[in-house]
């Protein structure tokens, strides 16, 4: 504004000395100059975007250089945007392209965390899970081999038709492998049994991506100690602490869509039990080796007993022959049914029933330094709804409510009192007893050999596929 006022003052001074014509010309030229200056001012105030339209006069030379630099910068930015768009699959603006580029980096295969927390289904986004150990079936009694099954197109087609089922077992098995590896990294004397079970189950729920009855834990975590062989898990308030001289059987299960992995191992800290563990592991592997399509269950039991009893162990200066626990068995597994009807004995003299194509079995063996027979003992913690029970009228409201809770959360899978506590249930013991008395729910109390004895267990789940036998729960550990 100051420049415009100066020009106007100068014009009035000149008008006093010139004749009228000259005064008109002078006034015109002064007005033109003032207008030019106004235009320049306006163009400068508009900034770089308007500067591109300025006339190339001397005073605007600096502005033109600025505009040129701006244009160069914007051209470089456009080029970078184009490159980013190509990396980001070619759609969206530059910023979107950069974001997509970052997402592309994240698409790489996920790796398991420590401690494990990434669900198995996220580690294998293509939905194909690792196979277990594939074995050829044993030769038949007349000496014929089963090698033809691996090349038969018919058997391959049958195997492929059930691929979705096998894949569910494999996902559950991979979760089991990773959980038990994690457990072995921290389990130690001094921990309470409740602490051990809850830590194990929390990890299992994450890896299996628990989802109601579609995926989750197949049965409570067994952590039976010493002479107790099976079906012990702590109830609320149990203060039992794991000791250095304890021999602990960790038996837990996972499932996807009711396809159950039943797998167990024994944990010890004192090396004096090593031979006992070796005997039972060898017996379990013998049972797995003998199992197959058309194999008689009694033959598997006889082979297991022969291997188990070939071992002697020395514990605290006393020698024992390892005995198979004759009233504990392996078993067939059905969908949402841990015991599907057939039993695999671990001593001779069992049923002559044959294993069949497409069946799933838990091959488990128990060795003992005691009598080799177990009986019910201690407080019950395991329960399971009877698979074959029909409609039973229930009068008590609390019993009806508890049955609804069991149906919604466990169905026909086994459960324990801790899991009812976790769901917020309280004062349910009378209702639970009522369900047991009515035959709707079966109790499974701890099974123990004589006091002072030691028991060990190893177990795997096998699939009798049309082409081969798959030890689906096999791992690097056992």
Swiss-Prot record:
The keyword Plastid does not apply. A divalent metal cation 1 binds at residues 251, 262, 459. Residues 36-46, 97-109 have a biased composition (Basic residues). GO terms for molecular function: aminopeptidase activity; initiator methionyl aminopeptidase activity; metal ion binding; metalloaminopeptidase activity; metalloexopeptidase activity; RNA binding. Coiled coil: none annotated. GO terms for biological process: protein processing; regulation of translational initiation. Residues 80-92 have a biased composition (Acidic residues). Substrate binds at residues 231, 339. GO terms for cellular component: cytoplasm; cytosol; plasma membrane. Binds 2 divalent metal cations per subunit. Has a high-affinity and a low affinity metal-binding site. The true nature of the physiological cofactor is under debate. The enzyme is active with cobalt, zinc, manganese or divalent iron ions. Most likely, methionine aminopeptidases function as mononuclear Fe(2+)-metalloproteases under physiological conditions, and the catalytically relevant metal-binding site has been assigned to the histidine-containing high-affinity site. Also manganese has been proposed to be the physiological cofactor for human METAP2. CDD domains: MetAP2. Glycans are attached at residues 60, 63. The keyword Glycoprotein applies. This is Methionine aminopeptidase 2. It comes from Homo sapiens (Human). The lineage of its organism: Eukaryota, Metazoa, Chordata, Craniata, Vertebrata.
